[in-house]
């Protein structure tokens, strides 16, 4: 019975991944097409999604690579430092037998769903597998399409923004009490850094400032 319960939770996680899957496929497709357009091989584009699985950071990597190798390495790292916070929250919420696997699949959208819905690690792994499969599959389709497609700039921008929009839609219902203050404080800090052309630094500063500023009233 215990085994069936774990299996059921894994399937439930897969089901909950459906909204993420629907958003990931077109964006990953765009990544595959863009990578081929910028001169990356099929293998390189696929390895980026298979081994990195980091959405916006992958776009940053392939667009910055030809300009500066250091920027292509360090900007994605800075963009992903927020996942340290995500991982610590999930680690406190769930008892993890496979922390390295769970950490690898923890994207913004997976975190937004799992922070309230995940009942155990099996659910989280199912949620992550569905999301990861969609991202890798979408990339493969984009790589196959390659440079035969002309990627309109407006379409590209809309598809990339859809990931951020999905994250907001999944996260907003969870914002209550001091979480609202954390979101507003973090957003203000991020915006200030963005206006100073320090967007990457602003992401990290916002991730740190939001929780700190939200706790000023002693809650």
UniProtKB/Swiss-Prot annotation:
Keyword Electron transport found: no
Segments passing through the bilayer: 14-34, 37-57, 123-143, 155-175, 189-209
Locations listed in the record: Cell membrane
UniProt keyword list: Cell membrane, Membrane, Transmembrane, Transmembrane helix, Transport
InterPro entries: Brnchd-chn_aa_trnsp_permease
Record carries keyword DNA repair: no
Membrane-topology descriptor: Multi-pass membrane protein
Family as reported in the entry's similarity comment: Belongs to the AzlC family.
Name recorded for this polypeptide: Uncharacterized membrane protein AF_1755
Species per Swiss-Prot/TrEMBL record: Archaeoglobus fulgidus (strain ATCC 49558 / DSM 4304 / JCM 9628 / NBRC 100126 / VC-16)
């Amino acid at each position: 019975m215990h085994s069936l319960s774990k299996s059921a939770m894994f399937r439930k996680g897969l089901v909950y991944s459906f909204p993420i899957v629907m958003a990931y496929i077109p964006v990953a497709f765009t990544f595959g097409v863009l990578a081929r357009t910028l001169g990356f091989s099929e293998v390189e584009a696929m390895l980026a999604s298979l081994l990195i699985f980091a959405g916006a950071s992958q776009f940053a990597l392939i667009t910055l690579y030809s300009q500066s190798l250091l920027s292509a390495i360090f900007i994605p790292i800075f963009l992903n430092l927020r996942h340290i916070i995500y991982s610590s929250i999930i680690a406190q919420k769930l008892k993890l037998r496979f922390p390295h696997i769970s950490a690898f699949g923890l994207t913004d959208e997976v975190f937004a769903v799992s922070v309230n819905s995940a009942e155990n690690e099996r659910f989280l792994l199912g949620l992550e597998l569905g999301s990861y499969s969609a991202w890798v599959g979408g990339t493969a389709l984009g790589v196959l399409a390659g440079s035969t497609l002309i990627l309109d700039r407006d379409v590209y921008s809309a598809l990339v923004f859809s990931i951020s929009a999905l994250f907001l839609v999944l996260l907003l219902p969870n914002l209550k009490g001091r979480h609202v203050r954390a979101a507003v404080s973090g957003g203000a800090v991020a915006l200030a850094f963005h206006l100073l052309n320090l967007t990457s630094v602003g992401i990290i500063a916002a991730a740190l400032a939001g929780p700190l500023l939200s706790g000023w009233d002693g809650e």
